[in-house]
């Protein structure tokens, strides 16, 4: 491919080094060996790290002496040379160097995604951060009735912006205003997304204390509390629901602290502010979610790979506040579920299987990983239906099959509530219906 497209950017996504025989981060020389003449940029599955070759570093203007930006790192070898992996805000120079998608490419991507979602039994999705040009491209498809998927959008400034870029871009969204229930309740843009840290796999999740397996490193926070408050204040003033990507316990504490301040300044008993992932929470902060009414959203399918590294990264004490689904539910929190696709497969039944069993698709570990935090089958089902709808202010429209709600449903190949639990991951859609129209059916 690199020979045929010599000199053109080659971009991709999906590598997870934790599953390799050697889980060390790869090097730029690995890519140079197969594509020396084209810039190559491959994003890790989590989206919070990327692997690039020498040509990509040159094109982006990065050398071994380039200082790390706030909230990101250009990883180096012991001799001081560039390794070939960058994290979080350090991805920004590459994002700016890579040509933007055309409208036609954006539309092709969403139509391919739509078919993948329908075939997996999904009728609605909540999009975790898209810029205005993507939403405008989708609107054109809705007007032509080619896009039938229901999308609840959180607006986001694309790339890895600095604070000034973040505020300028965000104010444009807020000025545009809310768009609710467009195209027969198929498109809503009423949320705003901001990332507070990175991922556990990339060791860029922002922690209160050092990583157990990397002393001296706490990950990367992206904003000061004042910066975060100022942009979220503008979002709330404009009526937007806010989503904060927060993986580490420091990021979740910042999220809760700033939300608490916001709710004092702009009181709202039904704000439904969200922490996206709420993955690692200091034990003393867990009860604050219910107290403040902050919704902790989760991606239970993350367990299938994170269980391989989480104990080593976090240690015996911090793991008690990680992936704490049972604890959060028992305290009265709804727990909306998802997959963060394309971070993981969009298959909801694999995610529900992980929620119920605390195991990977290979039925490991025996007995489940920290099984005391598992969900019941009914809770896992609610996490993809009622609770997810509630998290999007759409519980009056969807989330259950009853008179007056949207005719969106899926016919599956076995009884989810009664099949052996190891079969939950194998459930598949026979027919997917959106608005009373069959949009997918097995042949």
Task: Please identify what each model-predicted range represents.
Residues 1-171, 190, 194-251, 264, ...:
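Divalent metal-binding segments
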Residues 27-28, 175-176, 339, 419:
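Short beta-alpha junctions and helix-cap segments that line functional grooves
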Residues 108, 232-243, 247-273, 277-278, ...:
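His/Asp/Glu-enriched, well-ordered alpha-helical/loop segment
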Residues 141-145, 177-187, 266-268, 289-291:
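Acidic (Asp/Glu)-rich catalytic clusters
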Residues 186-204, 293-304:
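Non-cysteine beta-strand/loop elements that form the S-adenosyl-L-methionine
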Residues 442-443:
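Extracellular/periplasmic ectodomains of large secreted or surface enzymes and adhesion receptors
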